[in-house]
Design a protein with these regions (language model features):
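Membrane-embedded alpha-helical segments that form the functional core of polytopic membrane enzymes
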Residues: 1-15, 49-50, 63-77, 123-148
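Multi-pass membrane catalytic core of lipid/isoprenoid biosynthesis enzymes
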Residues: 17-63, 69, 161-186
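Membrane-interface loop-to-helix entry segments
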Residues: 41-43, 86, 90-95
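Structural signal for membrane-spanning alpha-helices in multi-pass inner-membrane proteins
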Residues: 49-57, 76-80, 101-109
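Membrane-interface helix caps and helix-loop-helix hairpins in membrane proteins
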Residues: 57-60, 80-89
Length: 186
């Protein structure tokens, strides 16, 4: 999962290099890495991640689970390439992807959770409820973060014709969405 996130950060930096050029503090490419090296790093992360995920799927006799990896890589790529400039949808995708990462915990222990369901149903239900609530909390926190980033990048996004949430709906409406998410968190 870490390599998927790392590759997502690299591909996002590649596609955002023109927008990031307007914010000297956000500039990664070409300030620290060349474009060629960034593409090589992206391919390296994806290749290594694919090999590790295939190995783990093979070792656990769950080859079908390997398909989660290319789906996640594709979603992060399509976000960086297109959905970042698609109002709210890109924010929701990244917030969901990031926020639901902790649901890998009950998924990894699904056999134990299945046994627990039959041994102590109230405890099983309570654990599931807590994981779901934690997932919702994390998604909302990350959605607030994504909306704040859109507000921060309003000028560079609008100058590059990137219709982020803040550009499309305006600063006031995006601030209202952010406050609404924060209220929902409380």
């Amino acid at each position: 999962f870490t390599l998927v996130c790392a590759s997502g950060n690299v591909i996002n930096a590649i596609f955002d290099r023109h927008i990031d050029a307007m914010h000297a503090t956000h500039l990664i490419i070409p300030k620290y890495f060349s474009l060629k090296f960034s593409w090589m790093l992206y391919v390296g992360f994806i290749t290594l991640g694919a090999a590790i995920s295939f190995y783990l799927a093979y070792r656990t006799h769950q080859i079908i689970l390997w398909w989660f990896y290319p789906i996640c890589v594709f979603l992060l790529w399509i976000y960086s390439y297109k959905l970042k400039c698609f109002p709210l949808l890109g924010n929701i995708l990244v917030a969901t992807f990031t926020g639901l990462a902790m649901l890998f915990i009950p998924f990894a222990f699904r056999e134990n959770m299945s046994e627990l369901r039959w041994m102590d149903y109230p405890l099983w239900a309570q654990l599931n409820y807590r994981f779901v609530m934690l997932g919702i909390f994390a998604v909302l926190c990350n959605l607030c973060r994504e909306l704040c980033k859109d507000l921060e990048d309003f000028i560079p996004d609008s100058s590059q014709f990137c219709e982020s949430t803040a550009v499309y709906y305006g600063i006031s409406t995006t601030k209202f969405m952010t406050v609404f998410c924060l209220i929902a968190l409380s």
